[in-house]
Regions:
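Cleavable N-terminal export/targeting peptides
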Residues: 1-33
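Short glycine/proline- and aromatic-enriched beta-strand/turn motifs that initiate or cap beta-hairpins
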Residues: 20-81
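Transmembrane beta-strands of outer-membrane beta-barrel pores
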Residues: 40-46, 66-68, 77-81, 102, ...
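Surface-exposed loop and membrane-interface regions of Gram-negative outer-membrane beta-barrel proteins
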Residues: 71-132
Length: 253
């Protein structure tokens, strides 16, 4: 349930008949930008929990940004298994989101928006112990250099949990440029499921991303302290929040 946004820096080199070298000048961004992204991942983890029963997923999306205002919107899809495993149906997660990002100051950035997680024909509202899996969250984020803190608040029930409206997720992390196309990814988060302490937990990730030019590769170790009863797969009993290695290959067009 986590959309992929791979940011690209646009740089233009100035050339001419000068007998001396000049610094490259960054090109002005166009008013409107669009991009597509696609990925294959060894295990789709969202907030530390496997959405695919510890198996691979195919993912892709589209993003639009209006640079003068900072407004953006997009959509993203992934294959999943958890809704069907829980007794419902469907094998797709479809996310729709919109928001606004910008700078509070030269050093501090912000991002605020709304995100809808749609699970077409999930049918969990017909399964005892669940409600409709479709979820809407509003979120706000502040960034300082490579570090950020983000809070997401559910304005509906959360991912099929009964009476879970107003659940919240706190996300703290940093994406540190290590040079040569490498980025170190650090994350810690806490999911509070309203009225359900057994389903609340903390997750973490330590990873590295490498831009190979043609594609981007990411390798991460992901884990949680989630309850094994609350997050065991109904299909085979496997714990969906166990510590594991995740590999992703992605491409932005």
């Amino acid at each position: 349930m986590k959309k992929i946004i791979l940011a690209a820096a646009v740089v233009a080199a100035f050339t001419g008949s000068h007998a001396y070298a000049e610094d490259a000048a960054p090109a002005a961004k166009p008013d409107n930008e669009t991009s597509f992204n696609a990925a294959v991942v060894s295990d789709y983890r969202y907030r530390g929990i496997s959405q695919t029963r510890l198996q691979p997923a195919l993912q892709g999306g589209f993003d639009y940004t209006n640079n003068p205002t900072g407004f953006y919107a997009g959509t993203w899809l992934s294959t999943i298994k958890w809704t069907k495993d829980a007794g419902g149906s469907g094998d797709i997660e479809w996310d729709l989101y919109a928001g606004k990002r910008g700078q509070v100051s030269e050093a501090v950035s912000y991002d605020a928006g709304v995100l809808a997680y749609v699970y077409p024909s999930n049918g969990l509202d017909n399964v005892t112990g669940f409600v409709d899996a479709n979820t809407v969250e509003i979120y706000g984020q502040l960034g300082y250099g490579p570090a950020y803190v983000k809070y997401s608040h559910a304005v509906t029930n959360l991912f099929g949990f009964v009476d879970s409206k107003h659940s919240g997720y706190l996300d703290i992390g940093a994406n540190i440029d290590a040079g040569e196309g490498y980025t170190v990814n650090l994350h810690a988060g806490h999911q509070e499921v309203k009225h359900n302490d057994a389903a609340s937990y903390t997750d973490w990730k330590v990873g590295v991303t490498k831009d190979f030019g043609v594609v981007t590769g990411a390798l991460a170790v992901i884990g949680t302290n989630a309850g094994k009863t609350a997050y065991a797969s109904p299909a085979n009993g496997k714990f969906l929040g166990k510590t594991a290695l995740q590999l992703m290959v992605s491409k932005t067009f």
